Structures are given as C-alpha cells and as structure tokens.
Amino acid sequence: MVKERKVKLKNKNGDTLLVLLREYRKGDEEGMIACIRDEYGETYFKRDFYDPEYIKSESDNHHIKFLAAQTEDKEIAGMMILKQFYPEESMCEIASQIFRKKYRGYGLALPFFQYGLELLKARNYSAAYCLPVTFHHITQVLLYRSGLRAAGFILNVFDLDKIIHSYENGRNTKHSQAIQIMALDKRDAGTLYLPVEHQKFAGMVYESLGVNFSFHKEKMISEWGESDMPDYSDMTFSNDAVQSNLEIRVLLVGRDFKKRLLNLHRQFPLCRKQTASLFLNCNDCHAVKAYEILKKMGYFFTGLKPLCSEKEYMVLHNPGKVQIYFDDYMVSSEFASLLLYVKYCYERSQNMVFGLGKDG
C-alpha cells in the first residue's frame, strides 16, 4: 500500500514549503476547483471538474482517483488525477496536474508525479500513459525523469480561443498533446503491420519502452486485395463540438472502411477549425491498406499509442483547414526528433493535398 507522504521543498529564494501528498478526501472539492480556476478560469476543457458532485461521484465509483497536494495550513496547493479506461483500454492515465500559481517554483511537480506513479504501479495496468501539453515542456521533462518515454503526438485537440492559460500559444490556433508512455504489465506488442516508411520511428519508440515487438514483412501495396478482408470495419468515433475535434478509433479494417470514413467526413466536415485524429490498430493485417487510403484522404502519421490496450495503435491526423506551426511547440529534447519527423510527414501530406509533390 502506498502511503501519503510529506515533502519539504525550497524555491530559488530559499523559501520553504511543506506539503502533504495524499489521495482525495471528501471536502477537497472546492480546493481542487480553485486550482483549476487559478490557471484556466472557467475554460478548462474537462468541464465536469468544476462540479464538486462530479468529483465526489467519480471518486466513489473509482473511475478517477483524485490526488491532492496539501499545505500545512490545509490549503490545496495542487491536484492530479489517475484515470482508468476499463474495459476499452488497460492503461492508466496520469493527468490534470494543476497547481495554484503561488505554489509554483518549489519543484512540487516531480515528487507529485512520482507519488502518482507509485499508486499507479501498485495496480495491474498495462502501461502508464500521459498527454503532456505542448505549450510548455516542463511536464515532458519531469515525466522522462520518472521513466515515461515519448511516443508521438495527438494534434489539434483543443481550440485555443476557448481555453485560457498562463503560457504562450504562439501562432497555433489549436492545442496539441504529446504522448508519453511507461511499460508496466504489457511487455509484448506483438506483430506490427506498419508501412516500411514508419518502421524506423516505431522501432525507436518500442525499443525505448523496453518491450518485445516485431514488424510483419510488408507486401507491396498492389498485392493487398480486399478478398480476405471482413465485410465490415469495426470503428468507433466521438466528436467534441466545443473543441471541433473528431476522434476515430479503428479496431478492424473491412471492405467498407473508405465508405465509412467518407460518411464521417460528411457528418463532420473538415472546415473552419474542425480536425480529425484517427487511431488505427496496427496489429490488424490490413492496417497498411487502411493507411494508404487515409494518406490519400489527407491524413498523416503523428506517432504511436503503444501498450494501452490489447491492440497497438498508430496515430494519424487530418488538420483540415487548420495550419500547424510546429516550430511554435515547446518540446523536450526527447520529443524534438519525433516532432521533426512528424513535421516532415505533415509537409509531405500538404504537398500531396495541394498537388505540389508526388504521392509517398
């Protein structure tokens, strides 16, 4: 059992801060909400977190484990959550680490992350998962020190006109997230059906995670037929109308894949700020065929979501009309090389979409 703990911290001026790191207790709700409001005002994308009753019920139902950093005078200096996704996914996400501004600069983030990871490791999860922001790299660096490794990006998730925070956005109009992973119970990714062009990237990610994996020898695309495909794809989707973000998950590719994708694009046209991210099961032997279809429709490779469920996923994105300024992202040195590769994939995709270059 992981016990609550006290940590003593100093800022650069020599001021000390004694904080108790612990699990949520009833009565913490208003203090946690105050942390959110101090940074985001009323614009935090997890709107339910402004509701004290939601925090109580999610904690009671064990869907979300809320954690608190409490000062000597009983004020909540910071909050964080551990969120599980059973039965769809077997990982646990460490997320929503938010501090009141007056308690920043003491180095509280690292011990708080480490405390959360200890709680997480005490359970049987396939992986620890985090989506750090890209408007600063503090979280990325601290998670790396804690053992999480870079795997890619989920682009254009949140409309920056609808979120207020205390960091610079640069020229981007939508906020993107990085993907960081630590392997826990899942130690074998199985056989991966990935395009040859992305296998070097994927190999680096899986090797950094220290798990077993293998690449299936890719057939020539012309050899991939539909005769051995199932009739119907297994796909799910959700669209966040507030953030103009469509998320598609493809568990199985069938003959109807392109038709169903086109129908989704008709339902949620990629105009104005509407964008789409797609998670493609790359343990499916038809993933390469699906990738070729997606590439022709304006999607490009942005990384991997590994070890989070029974299946492995590559991540793709269609920015629609949204311009992406990768140079304005704030990323750690570990993410920098991955970002350069994703930027290359984006520029190649844009050339294809606008007829400025050759396919591939």
Protein language model features and the residues they cover:
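C-terminal "cap" of GNAT-fold acetyltransferases
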Residues: 158-194, 310-335
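A conserved beta-strand-loop-helix scaffold within acyl/acetyltransferase catalytic domains
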Residues: 23-101, 133, 233-244, 250-256, ...
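Conserved catalytic-core motifs of GNAT/GCN5-like acyltransferases
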Residues: 131, 144-170, 300-311
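Conserved N-terminal entry element of GNAT/NAT acetyltransferase domains
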Residues: 1-27
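Non-catalytic interaction/regulatory modules that flank or connect domains
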Residues: 201-304
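Conserved acetyl-CoA-binding loop-helix of GNAT-fold acetyltransferases
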Residues: 99, 105-120, 127-130, 257-266
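Short, cationic low-complexity segments
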Residues: 193-225, 329-360
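Conserved GNAT acetyl-CoA-binding A-motif
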Residues: 120-133, 271-281
